[in-house]
């Protein structure tokens, strides 16, 4: 009984492969030579006059222009997205898109349409985002296994590639860890790789927006709903199991398996008995030719035509400001970039140990020289010729910095060439041990912290970061006004840090590794600019309130750095990135 069943399964598999290949070839021909049925007669009459054609707007354009040129009669089945963008430039048409068909449906895929493609055709185009989940939500071992899969991914079909990537990435991964990655890591990379031309249409229209994708739904749904305001997301659901009260992914698709976009779209719109108003597909995907054929208006995003264009969405046009994000990787982990990172890891670790040792054991001027020789670039500029020395000799200078990384006070003290004391909060024991300057922990108690900082100022110079936490993006968080009540000898310091491989901050990871990850970068950059000492009339001694002083310094630092001021706090950051208030018990 087993042998006949195996033969039947084998026969079905062979038949499926034959049909799949034949359908794929047919779709490729349809892509290159497809034309509208009603143009067949004109095609036979005019073939000798015109051998090539350009895309046109489609049936709506034909009805408004009955006297079409011969070139229009040869148009392919679906025009390019460029044609649709030209159509949107018509003011009347734009109005009709936003009102006449209100709550009609616009649908597309995120892979290769809403997001620009970066990966080679030999690998799945979504590989970098699977790698982000594997590295940030899983472990370095999982990330290495995912990278090793590239050695055979090129031999597989797209659906099989997706199954392999999903299994390696999600098998045994905690649901909680995936939630953290989708909330705090992926949105940054998705926003940076949004396709501006497709997004223009997405943002302009008031259609109900639905995304159909074969990708795991957990990978893209949060971003599409929270950042792009998608009304619905139809993707592949992954199996979950519960072990000891914790949920894990099995890495396998649940239900009917991986989503087929065209079939899911047909099922989705079957009950409404109404075709979707607009669909956009990828010209390089044969499946998309079928996928968008059910729309009233269908357009293709042509990657080949846009390779020379800059299709990245500018930061100022993000649907929501990108202020907070987490994770260690500072680059999009394509296969080659990920391979380069793993090759660099042992070298970078040894380099970080060397840089830390130099800062701890050697004099400031020697440490600066050797750090520069090892690739650390420090830009230092001061507007205080006397380094902000107080007019009265009975207290120290209070240096007020914006907060980019844990190493802000370290680079400031080495650049000034004199010892400073730094006040910190939630600093790890390891970071305290390797710090080349004195650190004092605060208790988050206003009265006690104020008294402690006053005592430290009476003994020497002090550096404080009133934001209370780091921020990677060009924004300044709200400054705590406590520092303004301590002294009138206040010197603002503008700080910026840039990395190319690893971020030296984290909200949900191990904070003790922050300085190591930062110093593992091949060429980290630190920029410090010491501003002029705050005039007495702008301090509390001159009649200003502590809030006015804090806001003034925040504004000055933002002006120098080209950053934007916000009213956000440490609590806001940790609620977004870690789901807690950032309080250390």
Curated annotation (Swiss-Prot):
Pathway connected to this protein: Phospholipid metabolism; CDP-diacylglycerol biosynthesis; CDP-diacylglycerol from sn-glycerol 3-phosphate: step 1/3
Enzyme class label: transferase
SUPFAM superfamilies: Glycerol-3-phosphate (1)-acyltransferase
Record membrane topology: Multi-pass membrane protein
GO cellular component terms, A-Z: membrane; mitochondrion
Function in brief: Esterifies acyl-group from acyl-ACP to the sn-1 position of glycerol-3-phosphate, an essential step in glycerolipid biosynthesis. Involved in pollen development, by being required for tapetum differentiation and male fertility. In addition to the sporophytic effect, it also exerts a gametophytic effect on pollen performance.
Keyword field contains Protein biosynthesis: no
Protein name: Glycerol-3-phosphate acyltransferase 1
Family annotation (PANTHER family): ANCIENT UBIQUITOUS PROTEIN, GLYCEROL-3-PHOSPHATE ACYLTRANSFERASE 1
CDD domains: LPLAT
Pfam family, one: Acyltransferase
Subcellular location: Membrane; Mitochondrion
Main location: membrane
Reaction(s) catalysed (UniProt annotation): sn-glycerol 3-phosphate + an acyl-CoA = a 1-acyl-sn-glycero-3-phosphate + CoA
Entry keywords, A to Z: Acyltransferase, Lipid biosynthesis, Lipid metabolism, Membrane, Mitochondrion, Phospholipid biosynthesis, Phospholipid metabolism, Transferase, Transmembrane, Transmembrane helix
Organism the protein comes from: Arabidopsis thaliana (Mouse-ear cress)
Entry text on domains: The HXXXXD motif is essential for acyltransferase activity and may constitute the binding site for the phosphate moiety of the glycerol-3-phosphate.
Protein family membership: Belongs to the GPAT/DAPAT family.
EC number of this enzyme: 2.3.1.15
Keyword Glycoprotein carried by entry: no
Tissue specificity as recorded in UniProt: Highly expressed in developing siliques and flower buds. Weakly or not expressed in roots, seedlings and leaves.
Positions of short motif HXXXXD motif: 403-408
Deleted gene: phenotype: Plants display a massive pollen development arrest due to a perturbed degeneration of the tapetum, which is associated with altered endoplasmic reticulum profiles and reduced secretion. Defects correlate with several fatty acid composition changes in flower tissues and seeds. However, no significant change in seed oil content is observed.
TM stretches of this protein: 126-146, 334-354, 356-376
